[in-house]
Amino acid sequence: MVICCAAVNCSNRQGKGEKRAVSFHRFPLKDSKRLIQWLKAVQRDNWTPTKYSFLCSEHFTKDSFSKRLEDQHRLLKPTAVPSIFHLSEKKRGAGGHGHARRKTTAAMRGHTSAETGKGTIGSSLSSSDNLMAKPESRKLKRASPQDDAAPKVTPGAVSQEQGQSLEKTPGDDPAAPLARGQEEAQASATEADHQKASSSTDAEGADKSGISMDDFTPPGSGACKFIGSLHSYSFSSKHTRERPSVPREPMDRKRLKREMEPRCSGNSVAQSPPSSSLTATPQKASQSPSAPPTDVTPKPAAEAVQSEHSDASPMSINEVILSASGACKLIDSLHSYCFSARQNKSQVCCLREQVEKKNGELKSLRQKVSRSDSQVRKLREKLDELRRASLPYLPYLSGLLPPSHEPPKLNPVVEPLSWMLGTWLSDPPGVGTFPTLQPFQYLEEVHISHVGQPMLNFSFNSFHPETHKPMHRECGFIRLKPDTNKVAFVSAQNTGIVEVEEGEVNGQELCVSSHSVSRISFAKEPHVEQITRKFRLNSEGKLEQTVSMATTTQPMTQHLHITYKKVTP
């Protein structure tokens, strides 16, 4: 999978540039506060980041990264928040408005050419239509951003065309005013059709100022559509309501006369037929010699078109914008509320997903706990059964479970051996040596108990120290002759040896040696001939055992030594 940047209009992806030139960083999904800050900075609608969402390092300032070596991967600080997004947005906005202006200019050129074509109906009306069409076409060419390549018309050429048109239309012709009236009616009808077509086009696409409704209306938002309509109302409603109900045709003729008279003032030919409608408009104050010169600075096509439609109104577009500034501020605040509400909705959705995930994990943990409780309940039932059975071969259960009845009293005969009672574990591991064996270590567990009889029960169970596999095992009884210190040690081993050892107990020390040794017929050689044992309770309360033995090939030699610590009484 190729890692890409999740920012809008960012084309950075893994492997696109030089190595380590751009790094990618995951969204902090586990930190809810920091995740909300990242989402506010990215400003993506109806989008929720996942564990595969990244932002490239170009959206973070230099102080957002921790100081590391050059060959190490860049690491964000725990408080880093992306903040660099405005450059790409400005470039996108500039390109979009330029396209709108070019589109508006091209559309107005097409309408002007169509109007000029409709005006040339007959030979008697051609010269008058030239006077109506050429100022407008020249005005549009001057307002177009591509006016450098457009041909320019000089005032001399205009005056020459005016003279030719006046020569072709004699002033003493009684039908001339009627022809001019019909021509003006046709021109006004054509212009009305043009206004209807342009208004329908503006309703579908961009308005007169070159700003599209899509700039204020995010998709799928009824509140934003309403706010966008308020925007269009704030720019056009007041201007439309204050526009006078004067017919469009006289205003166009006045504007045409105002533009044509300064250009024709330098010409020596001054023709003013009393029957011509072109001389019926008095000169305005702006055309006086003391008035400032007309601003001929090239303007965008959208402003040129808007100025044509707003010359008849006492308010200019700047005055309209100034009068609507308060409304625009209110509408901008509504816009910010609308977008912030949508961002809050996306944040709530993200937090809701995290809560649902945590609830799922909690549910699985509860299921595991319930299963564990059922297992513990079953184990307790089994232990209760064992306790009720009071099995004699499980003496260690008396230390784990509360007794079902009172433990048996120690027989007074075995009182001198009471220091050996309990469960003992090797600490540290025991050591084994013999001339015919490799030295080794082992773990051992010892159980010495009684059931009220004049004897002790014992079992020795040894294990490997690493694998914990069972090794040597033996069990048996320790008997004490009444009113003496003479002791008999009877044991059976898993190696096939059965022995009887006898000795004496002196305080907390017991020494016994083999009295008879028996073995199975297929026991391993060399056979054991004699065994001695010594048990002692040291000053630390630990039990020590030392075992020596003699075989058919070796004399009496120490074989085992181990120390036990008591774990249960």
UniProtKB/Swiss-Prot annotation:
Query: What Gene Ontology cellular-component terms does the record carry?
Result: cytosol; nucleoplasm
Zinc finger intervals, THAP-type: 1-85
Which Gene3D superfamilies does the record match to this protein?
2.40.128.20, THAP domain
User: Catalytic activity, per the record?
Assistant: peroxynitrite = nitrate
Q: Show the ranges annotated as biased composition (Basic and acidic residues).
A: 242-262
Q: Where is the composition biased (Low complexity)?
A: 280-289
EC number, as in UniProt: 5.99.-.-
Q: Where is this region: Disordered?
A: 88-216, 235-312
- Keywords from the UniProt entry: Cytoplasm, DNA-binding, Heme, Iron, Isomerase, Metal-binding, Nucleus, Phosphoprotein, Zinc, Zinc-finger
Cross-referenced Pfam families: THAP, THAP4_heme-bd
Q: Which GO terms describe its molecular function?
A: DNA binding; heme binding; identical protein binding; nitric oxide binding; peroxynitrite isomerase activity; zinc ion binding
Q: Which GO terms describe its biological process?
A: nitrate metabolic process; tyrosine metabolic process
Q: What is this protein called?
A: Peroxynitrite isomerase THAP4
Cofactor binding, note field: Binds 1 heme b group per subunit, that coordinates a highly solvent-exposed Fe(III) atom.
Q: What is known of its domains?
A: The C-terminal nitrobindin region coordinates a heme and bears the isomerase activity. The N-terminal zinc finger domain likely binds DNA and may be involved in transcriptional regulation.
Q: Does the keyword Nucleotide-binding apply?
A: no
| Motif HCFC1-binding motif (HBM) per UniProt: ranges | 230-233
This protein's source sits in the domain of life called Eukaryota
**InterPro entries, alphabetized:** Calycin, Nitrobindin, THAP4-like_heme-bd, THAP_Znf, THAP_Znf_sf
> Part of which pathway?
Nitrogen metabolism
Subunit and interaction comment = Homodimer.
Query: Which gene carries the instructions for this protein?
Result: Thap4
Catalytic class of the enzyme: isomerase
